[in-house]
Regions:
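Nucleotide/pyrophosphate-binding catalytic subdomain
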Residues: 1-273, 278, 448-450, 469
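Positions that flank functional sites
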Residues: 158-159, 238-240, 296, 362, ...
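Short phosphate-binding/catalytic loops that engage adenosine nucleotides
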Residues: 34, 148, 286, 352, ...
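A conserved regulatory-domain signal marking ACT and ACT-like small-molecule sensing domains
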Residues: 299-469
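Acidic carboxylate-rich catalytic motifs and surrounding loops in phosphoryl-/glycosyl-chemistry enzymes
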Residues: 156, 291-294
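Short hydrophobic alpha-helical runs that function as membrane-insertion/retention elements
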Residues: 230-234, 288-290, 355
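Acidic/polar loop patches that form or flank catalytic/metal-binding clefts of enzymes
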Residues: 274, 285-292
Length: 469
């Protein structure tokens, strides 16, 4: 039985016209595949609104969070009024929306009266996954209205995780058992499940979230669990790009990447792909396609084993924020590394990844990558918190904190074509480089520069992609 898992991101389900396009895609692919599984994100912008509402609840601002919930209700009800739904489906959806939002108001009320930080983190996860639940119910209703047997399923019953709220780690084996029990029987009956991305639950049933972009990870776990032949990630761009088009206007679509290249691309800042998405499917050799929901005829980008080394060139270049710490002394870096990790976790619920550490007899340097999943304010908040903590720990010596950019060239040819490294360094001549690192996968080569040199470094390396010879 040919099985396809399709994930629709927030930009793919953000408007009525986008949902009609999703319906068209599903109806078309239903004719080509024996079994379909859909994974959906919240409507575009909804998760950010829910995070804002939770913050207001923590501050006791009842009027503020109630206003946001009212706006969410208005938006979702307006959408289902515009969709081609019968009265029965529309009425049931309205009841579902109200029930979910009333439950969320109860969570916010509990946050207002709690000073327990751990409990607040648990409640945050319980509340911000509501957007996915709303979207899943709307899409399932739209499919049923068009004679597709469909049901919305919450992944709190499927994806089993640890209790790292905000960036939970799935237990793949336990999740696959849940998928076999709850999803496979539906597929055998010809039902199309519409499954919430981003969310999971601990073994005790406490809701968790998988970090920003976590719906990709949901799709890969489901793909492995149902034995999918392919996974398609639908978004609002034509595929993975050679660079972020917001930073490099000559960026173009990458037709094909290996698993290793795509994983490095995600790790070093590509926002289209979750950093942990590929791990559950590599051993299964399931190919992934990234496609534009508004231009479904375009081929998109393919991720699969082996990338065609005959190209022997750089595939992409990325930029991601980091924090660099320097000191005019030598000594153990373990204490300062632990302090950075603790500070980042306190501010973002993400752990620090030490990118580069180096020492001479008189100088120490440490560069820490701030993952995109930590959110847009992570770099600023971490910088300020680190400066404060370091000023209180003079015994460890005087450390200076700077915001930096980590510019990374991606290619699986670095291991057998070392001249690529020379080409990158030659392209960056006259730019001050703070540090260098080649990834253990041999698919990445990174340079650390002060943030105001990031754009220039990106453009220079991207020229090597456009003109490889």
């Amino acid at each position: 039985m040919k099985t396809l898992v399709m994930k629709f991101g927030g930009s793919s389900v953000g408007t009525t016209s986008a949902l009609i396009q999703v319906l068209s895609i599903v109806l078309n692919e239903r004719e080509q595949w024996d079994r379909l599984v859909l994974v959906v994100s919240a409507l575009d912008g909804v998760t950010d609104m829910l995070i804002e509402a939770a913050g207001l609840a923590n501050m006791g601002n009842q009027r503020g969070y109630r206003r946001i919930v009212a706006n969410l209700r208005t938006r979702h009800l307006a959408m289902i009024e515009e969709l081609p739904l019968g009265n029965s489906e529309r009425g049931a959806l309205q009841a579902d929306i109200d029930r979910l939002l009333f439950d969320m108001l109860d969570i916010y009320q509990g946050m207002t009266h709690s000073s327990d930080r751990w409990a607040a983190t648990q409640k945050l996860d319980a509340s911000i996954g509501v957007g996915e639940k709303l979207a899943a119910r709307i899409i399932a209703a739209l499919l049923r209205q068009n004679d597709v047997r469909s049901v919305a399923i919450d992944t709190t019953n499927l994806i089993v995780t640890d209790d790292s709220h905000g960036n939970a780690i799935p237990n793949i084996a336990m999740s696959r058992t849940q998928i076999a029990t709850n999803v496979l029987p539906l597929l055998e009956r010809g039902i199309v499940p519409v499954i919430t991305g981003f969310i999971g639950a601990t073994r005790s049933g406490q809701p968790t979230t998988l970090g920003r972009g976590g719906s990709d990870l949901t799709a890969s776990i489901l793909g492995a669990g149902v034995g999918a032949q392919e996974i398609w990630l639908w978004t609002d761009v034509d595929g993975l790009m050679t660079a972020d088009p917001r930073e490099v206007d000559t960026a173009r679509v990458i037709p094909h990447l290996s698993y290793e290249e795509a994983a490095e691309l995600a790790y070093f800042g590509a926002r289209i792909l979750h950093t942990r998405m590929l791990a559950p499917i590599q051993s299964e050799h399931i190919p992934v396609w990234i496609k534009n929901v508004f231009k479904p005829q375009k081929p998109g980008s393919n991720i699969s084993p082996g990338s065609g080394r005959s190209e022997l060139t750089i595939k992409a270049v990325t930029s991601i924020a980091g924090v660099a710490l320097t000191a005019d002394h030598s000594g153990s870096l373990s204490t300062i590394s632990a302090l950075v990790d603790q500070t980042l976790y306190e501010n973002t619920r993400s752990h620090a990844d030490v990118m580069i550490s180096s020492q001479s007899s008189t100088r120490s340097f440490l560069c820490v990558l701030i993952p995109t999943a930590a959110g847009p304010d992570a770099i600023h908040n971490t910088h300020i918190a680190l400066e404060k903590k370091l000023s209180e720990q003079a015994a460890d010596g005087v450390w200076r904190v700077n915001t930096v950019s980590i510019i990374t060239a991606i290619s699986d040819s670095f291991d057998h074509r070392p001249q690529l490294v020379a080409q990158v360094l030659n392209a960056l001549r006259n730019l001050p480089i703070l540090g260098l690192a080649q990834g253990p996968s041999n698919c990445s080569f990174s340079v650390v520069v002060n943030s105001h040199y990031a754009d220039e470094a990106l453009i220079r390396i991207h020229e090597l992609i456009l003109n490889p010879h």
